[in-house]
């Protein structure tokens, strides 16, 4: 039983780490491409900024979904019922 709980905690930690890493890489690429495109065509900066914020919200959703799944596995572990 303790092995299942330990493996679940480790798995949830890895899930959160990869979600945070993916979100950070996504924000870095998004910011770099936004600055590059704004420097190339300054008249489109306001339109690009709106689209950038929409994509940034979707990138944040990845981390929030990972938090939700991790909390599900930690507090309402579906694998403990398989042991009985």
From Swiss-Prot:
What the entry lists under SUPFAM superfamilies is as follows:
F1F0 ATP synthase subunit C
Site (Reversibly protonated during proton transport) residue list:
60
Per the record, membrane topology reads: Multi-pass membrane protein
NCBIfam families tied to this protein: ATP_synt_c, PRK06876.1
Name of the featured protein = ATP synthase subunit c
Task: Identify the InterPro entries for this entry.
Answer: ATP_synth_csu_bac/chlpt, ATP_synth_F0_csu, ATP_synth_F0_csu_DDCD_BS, ATP_synth_F0_csu_sf, ATPase_proteolipid_c-like_dom, F/V-ATP_Csub_sf
| Quaternary structure annotation from Swiss-Prot or TrEMBL | F-type ATPases have 2 components, F(1) - the catalytic core - and F(0) - the membrane proton channel. F(1) has five subunits: alpha(3), beta(3), gamma(1), delta(1), epsilon(1). F(0) has three main subunits: a(1), b(2) and c(10-14). The alpha and beta chains form an alternating ring which encloses part of the gamma chain. F(1) is attached to F(0) by a central stalk formed by the gamma and epsilon chains, while a peripheral stalk is formed by the delta and b chains.
What is the top-level taxon of the source organism?
Bacteria
Question: Where in or outside the cell?
Answer: Cell inner membrane
Provide this UniProt record's keywords sorted from A to Z. ATP synthesis, Cell inner membrane, Cell membrane, CF(0), Hydrogen ion transport, Ion transport, Lipid-binding, Membrane, Transmembrane, Transmembrane helix, Transport
Function according to Swiss-Prot or TrEMBL: F(1)F(0) ATP synthase produces ATP from ADP in the presence of a proton or sodium gradient. F-type ATPases consist of two structural domains, F(1) containing the extramembraneous catalytic core and F(0) containing the membrane proton channel, linked together by a central stalk and a peripheral stalk. During catalysis, ATP synthesis in the catalytic domain of F(1) is coupled via a rotary mechanism of the central stalk subunits to proton translocation. Key component of the F(0) channel; it plays a direct role in translocation across the membrane. A homomeric c-ring of between 10-14 subunits forms the central stalk rotor element with the F(1) delta and epsilon subunits.
Q: Which coarse location class describes where this protein primarily resides?
A: membrane
The Swiss-Prot or TrEMBL record annotates one GO molecular function as: proton-transporting ATP synthase activity, rotational mechanism
Pfam assignment, any one: ATP-synt_C
**One term under GO cellular component:** proton-transporting ATP synthase complex
Name residues in a coiled coil. none
Q: Where are the transmembrane segments?
A: 9-29, 54-74
Family, according to the entry, reads as follows: Belongs to the ATPase C chain family.
Per the UniProt record, the source organism is Haemophilus influenzae (strain PittEE)
């Amino acid at each position: 039983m303790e092995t299942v709980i330990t493996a679940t905690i480790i798995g949830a930690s890895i899930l959160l780490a990869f979600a945070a890493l993916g979100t950070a890489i996504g924000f870095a690429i998004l910011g770099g491409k936004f600055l590059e495109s704004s420097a190339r065509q300054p008249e489109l900066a306001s339109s690009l900024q709106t689209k950038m914020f929409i994509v940034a919200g979707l990138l944040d959703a990845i981390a929030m979904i990972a938090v939700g799944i991790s909390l599900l596995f930690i507090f309402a572990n579906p694998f403990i019922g398989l042991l009985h």
